[in-house]
A protein has these predicted regions:
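A short acidic, leucine-rich amphipathic alpha-helix
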Residues: 24-31
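Short amphipathic alpha-helical interaction segments
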Residues: 34-45
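A short, conserved structural fragment
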Residues: 47-58
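Short, charged/polar, Gly/Pro-enriched secondary-structure boundary elements
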Residues: 68-75
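Long, low-complexity, charge-rich intrinsically disordered regions
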Residues: 75-110
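Short alpha-helical segments that sit at the start of domains
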Residues: 1-11
Length: 110
């Protein structure tokens, strides 16, 4: 675990227990002196690689999961994001395929 990951983990684990104590990434960045990009990458690594129960919401920020209800809410929000990204990916793929067909038709007409 990196120094920044340890700093973030200790802060969230001790000061952000439960959704009611969540901190936005902007405020955490200021409090911990870690730029926002690095903060996001570290939190992702803490959850993904180190399996730490750190949740995030688009409005409240980052927090340490404190109960089953918070886990369920965090899980539902992640699944919602996954579905939206999947739909975006599908739109991108279909749009690209359509644009290739238009170009092919234009070339045939020449």
């Amino acid at each position: 675990m990196t120094d920044n990951e340890l700093i973030i983990l200790n802060y969230i684990k001790n000061r952000c227990r439960g959704k009611q104590h969540a901190e936005t990434f902007g405020r955490l960045s200021l409090l911990l002196g870690i730029n926002e990009r690095e903060l996001r990458l570290c939190v992702a690594e803490l959850v993904t690689h180190w399996q730490q129960p750190i949740a995030s919401t688009s409005d409240a920020g980052y927090y340490w999961l404190n109960c089953d209800d918070e886990y369920q809410q965090a899980s539902n929000e992640l699944m919602s994001r996954i579905r939206k990204l999947s739909m975006r990916h599908k739109g991108l793929r279909l749009g690209y395929m359509k644009s290739k067909q238009v170009i092919t038709k234009q070339l045939v007409m020449l």
